[in-house]
């Protein structure tokens, strides 16, 4: 079996369908005795240029090990799914399991925010002190 990196972009209005799509695609890979080495849901991101008058899309990255026939089935599923705006399947030399630069940047941003989530750590402390 070969290793592949798969990225697909979903229409932003169909973002709620993404978990089901991921489950369906990963299910097809595991049924064919393939392995999922990395799965990252990057969420909605700004596009570099408009696609079908859209400026954002929901991105998903997968690194898998699967038979070529399964990858062909996935590409066909992408082609006939109107919610998938673009997809890219690349063969890689080996399994990539480390976090992508996009995921690392997101983790870094989240760690800088502190335990309060979206608000800064100082704002959360100021509210607690005021109470």
UniProtKB/Swiss-Prot annotation:
The gene is rpsF. CDD domains: bS6. The keyword Transit peptide does not apply. PANTHER family: MITOCHONDRIAL 28S RIBOSOMAL PROTEIN S6, SMALL RIBOSOMAL SUBUNIT PROTEIN BS6M. Belongs to the bacterial ribosomal protein bS6 family. It comes from Shewanella oneidensis (strain ATCC 700550 / JCM 31522 / CIP 106686 / LMG 19005 / NCIMB 14063 / MR-1). This is Small ribosomal subunit protein bS6. GO terms for molecular function: small ribosomal subunit rRNA binding; structural constituent of ribosome. Keywords: Ribonucleoprotein, Ribosomal protein, RNA-binding, rRNA-binding. Residues 96-131 are annotated as: Disordered. Pfam families: Ribosomal_S6.
């Amino acid at each position: 079996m070969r290793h592949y990196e798969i990225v697909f972009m979903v229409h932003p209005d169909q973002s709620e369908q993404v978990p089901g799509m991921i489950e369906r695609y990963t299910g097809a890979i595991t049924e064919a005795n393939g392995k999922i080495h990395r799965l990252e849901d990057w969420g909605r991101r700004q596009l570099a240029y408009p696609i079908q008058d859209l400026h954002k899309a929901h991105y998903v990255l997968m690194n898998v090990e699967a038979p070529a026939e399964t990858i062909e089935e996935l590409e066909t599923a992408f082609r006939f799914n109107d919610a998938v705006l673009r997809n890219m399947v690349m063969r890689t030399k080996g399994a990539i399991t480390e976090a992508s630069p996009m995921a690392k940047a997101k983790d870094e941003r989240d760690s800088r925010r502190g335990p309060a989530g979206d608000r800064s750590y100082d704002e959360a402390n100021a509210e607690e002190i005021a109470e």
